[in-house]
Amino acid sequence: MNMIQIFGTNKSFDCKAAQRFFKERRLPFQFVDLKEKEMSQGEFESVVAVLSKNLGSRTSAIEALIDPKSKDYSSVAYLDDSDKESKLFENQAKLLIQPVCRNGKTEATVGMAQKIWEGWR
C-alpha cells in the first residue's frame, strides 16, 4: 500500500483541510512541513513527472506548481523554464502551491483536489 504524502506548511489552511480529508477517510498519510524539510530531488522529480504526464509537458507541470500569489513569485516569473525549475526546487516553502499531495510514484496533485483524492487508497 502506498503512503500518501502531503507537502506544505502548518500555516496553510488548504494543508490542514487536506489532512482533515484523509483523516476523515481513515487513509494513512505523512505530513511533511516544507519549512522543516523540503522535498528531496527524487520526490520533486516524481511529482513533476506525474504532473507532466497529466498536463502534457514538463513546463506546464512546473507552471502548475508555482503559486502566482506568492510574495516571491516575481523572482521566477520571467526566468527561463530550466531556471524556473531549479528556483522552485530551492524555494519550495515560498513558491509551491500548497498542498502538494503524492500517492506513491504514480499519483500527485497540486492544491485542493478532493475529486482525485477520492480514488486514492
Predicted regions and their residues:
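Local sequence-structure signature of Cys/Sec-based thiol-disulfide redox active-site neighborhoods
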Residues: 1-37
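Thiol/selenol-based redox catalytic cores and closely related redox-interacting motifs
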Residues: 36-121
